[in-house]
Amino acid sequence: MESADSAGKGSTEQSESQRQSQMDRLDREEAFYQFVNNLNEDDYRLMRDNNLLGTPGEITKEELLRRLQQIKEGPPQPSTEGTRGDPVSASGDPAEDSSNGDSIIDWLNSVRQTGNTTRSGQRGNQSWRAVSRTNPNSGDFRFSLEINVNRTSGNPSMPSLEQSSEMPGAEDMEVSSQGENENEPEPVAPRVAQAEVTEEAPVQRGQRRARSRSPDQRRTRARTDRSRSPLHQAVEPPIRRAQHSSSQTVDASSTEEAEGSSRTRHHVSSQMQNSSSSNETEGSSRTRQHITARQQALGTEGQSQSQTQTQSQSQTQTQSQTQSQSTVHLSNPESRSSSQPPQTDSSSNAETTGTGQRPPTIVLDLQVRRVRPGDYRQRDSIANRTRSRSQTPNNTVTYESERGGFRRTFSRSERAGVRTYVSTIRIPIRRILNTGLSETTSVAIQTMLRQIMTGFGELSYFMYNDNDTDPNNPTPVSPPAAVPGEAQNLVSPEPPAPIVEPPEPVAPVESEEGSNVSTSSARREGRNSRGGVTFEESGSLPFLSLAQFFLLNEDDDDQPRGLTKEQIDNLSTRNFGENDALKTCSVCITEYTEGNKLRKLPCSHEYHVHCIDRWLSENSTCPICRRAVLVAGNRESIV
C-alpha cells in the first residue's frame, strides 16, 4: 500500500510539473505573438532577417526586447582600419589566436548577431582567417575563409618570416575588396579564390637571399614602373610573385601600414610600385591566369640564367619549401561577373535578362595553380621562350555539367609550364539564410560547404591524374563525381588537407593543395590504390569542424525548398479587420486579434505574418491547399 501511494504521489507531482511547464510555454507563446504584433514593419524584418525571433514558446518577451535593442544599437564593428593597419592580427592576434579548431564554430554562431566579423587562428604551421560580411536588407552574405599551410624542411625560422610577409598582403587584399564592394557596385577582380602551390629551389639562408637581390631588384622595379612590361616584372622570386599575383589590388595606404620587418618592406614596396601596372592586367580571370603564368615562367627563366646549373641542383637537394594558400570567396554574382570563366559568364548574362530581380546567388571559384620548376630548365634558349610565349592554349580541357540547379565548370590548361585547374560552381540560394548558422538543419549552409569541399576534391582528382600523364600530351580527364552529375553524393567530413606525395627524382612537384574529400566510392578506391599518399594534420583545419558542425550527409536534399526573403516580402500583407474576429491562423491555431498583421498568399489563404514567413522559409506551398506559392518560372534563381 505504501509503495502504491508513493508511486501515485510521484506521478501526480510529475503531471503537475508537466502541466505547469505547458502553462509557462503557453504564456511565452502569447507574449511572443503580442511582441511580434506590436513590431513595426522595419523592426520585424530586422529581427526576422537576423534570425532573432526564435521559436514561439521557447523565448521570453524580455529576451526578444534585448535582442531588438542590441541589433538596433548595432554590433561593435571590427574596425576595418584596425584590421588593415595591424599586421599582427593577420598572422594570428593573441586575442584571436586559438589552438582550438572549434573556435570557428563559435564565430559562426555569432555571425547572426554581430553581422560583420573577423576571426583568425593558428595551429602549428597552419593558420586560418575567416571574414563574414552580411547585409540584412539585401540578403547578401559573403563568407571568406583563408587557410595557409607553411611547410619547410631545413631552416625552421623561415615559416614565420614568410608568413609575416605574406599574411598582411592577403588580409589587405581582403579588406580592400570588401570596402570597394560596399561603396561601389562595380566588380572587383581579386575575388577569384586562388590556391597557388609554388615550389622552387631557394637559397640556403634567408639573409643571403635578401642581400643578393636588393640592388638589382630595385633597378628592375624602377624599369618595371617605367615600361610596365611583363618581361621586366618577371625577375621576382617565385614565392614573391605568388604573393604579388594574389594581392595585385592592394592599395598603397594599406600596404604602408603593413611594414614591419625588412622582408615585409621589400614586399610592400614591390606591391606599391607594381600596383599601377597590375591594373592593366585585370580583364577576365582567364586573361589574368595567362599573364600570371607568363610572368612566373619568365621569372624562373631569369633566375635560371643568373644561377649555374650546379647551384640549382645542390640547392634542390639541400632544401625545398612549399607554400600553399587557399582562399574561398562567396559573394553576390553581380559583383563577381568579371572574375568568372567565360563559359559560366555567357550563360549568366543570358539568364540575367530573362529573370529580372533575382535572389542572391553564391558563386564559388576555386583555382589551383601548380608550377613545375623542372620544366623551366629546358627553356633557357630565346627560341624556346618565344615559342612558349606565343603558343595558344590548345591543350585546355573543359567539362561542364548541371544537375539539381548547380552549374559546375571544370577546366585544366597548361601554358609555359604552369598548369591551372579551375572549378567554378554556381549555387542558387532559394531559401532564406537566416534559418541560423547555429542550427544544424540549415540546408543552404550544408549545401555551400558540400560544394566547397567537393570542388576541392575534384581539383585534387585532376591533379592526381595529371601526375601520371605526359605534360606535353595531356589527356581529357573528367572527375568521376561530375560524370554522373551526382550532386548529392556523400561527402566525408574531412578538411582539404595538403596532400604530400613521396619525393621522386624525376618529378619536381612533391606537394599539392587539394582535399581529402571523397564524393564516391570509386574515388576512394582510386585513391587507395595509388598508395604512398599521406595526410598531415588532417584534423587541424577548420573545415573538419565545419563539416561535423553542419552534419553533412547524403540524406539532405540539395534542392532548396523554401522561398527567399525577397519572394516572401513581395507577398501582400494587411492589418487585422473587423471581419477577422472569428478567423484562426492555421499555422499557430490561434485566433486573429486586434493589431495582427496578416499575409495573403496567391491562393487567397491568409496567416499571421510571422507564422507564414517561417513556413515559407522551409516550404514553397500553402499549408492548407498545398498549392505552389510561386510558379516555377518565378522561383528560378539560377543566374
UniProtKB/Swiss-Prot annotation:
Keyword set for this entry? Developmental protein, Metal-binding, Nucleus, Transferase, Ubl conjugation pathway, Zinc, Zinc-finger
Report the pathway entry.
Protein modification; protein ubiquitination
Q: Where is the composition biased (Polar residues)?
A: 110-138, 147-166, 244-253, 290-302, 349-358, 383-399
- Pfam families reported for this sequence: zf-RING_2
Low complexity bias (residue ranges): 11-21, 269-286, 303-327, 335-348
Q: Which PROSITE patterns match?
A: ZF_RING_2
Q: Which GO terms describe its molecular function?
A: DNA-binding transcription factor binding; identical protein binding; ubiquitin-protein transferase activity; zinc ion binding
Q: Where are the zinc fingers (RING-type)?
A: 585-626
Where is the motif PDZ-binding annotated in this sequence?
636-639
Annotated InterPro entries: RING_finger_E3_ligase (IPR051834), Znf_RING (IPR001841), Znf_RING/FYVE/PHD (IPR013083)
Ranges of Pro residues compositional bias?
473-482, 493-506
Q: Which reaction does it catalyse?
A: S-ubiquitinyl-[E2 ubiquitin-conjugating enzyme]-L-cysteine + [acceptor protein]-L-lysine = [E2 ubiquitin-conjugating enzyme]-L-cysteine + N(6)-ubiquitinyl-[acceptor protein]-L-lysine
Q: What is its EC number?
A: 2.3.2.27
Question: Which domain of life does the UniProt lineage start with?
Answer: Eukaryota
The annotated regions of Basic and acidic residues compositional bias extend over 213-228, 372-382
Assembly and partners are described as: Forms homodimers through the C-terminal region. The N-terminus interacts with the homeobox of LIM/homeobox factor lhx1/lim1, with lhx3/lim3 and lhx5/lim5, and with the N-terminus of ldb1.
User: What does this gene product do?
Assistant: Acts as an E3 ubiquitin-protein ligase specific for ldb1, mediating ubiquitination and proteasome-dependent degradation of excess ldb1 in a RING-dependent manner. Does not degrade ldb1 bound to lhx1/lim1, nor lim1 itself and thus contributes to the establishment of proper ldb1-lhx1/lim1 stoichiometry and the formation of a ldb1-lhx1/lim1 complex. Interferes with Spemann organizer function and suppresses secondary axis formation induced by ldb1 and lhx1/lim1.
- Return the PANTHER family for the record: E3 UBIQUITIN-PROTEIN LIGASE RLIM, SI:CH211-59O9.10
User: What family is reported?
Assistant: Belongs to the RNF12 family.
Q: What is this protein called?
A: E3 ubiquitin-protein ligase RNF12
Source organism (scientific name): Xenopus tropicalis
Q: What is the lineage of its organism?
A: Eukaryota, Metazoa, Chordata, Craniata, Vertebrata
Gene of origin? Answer: rnf12
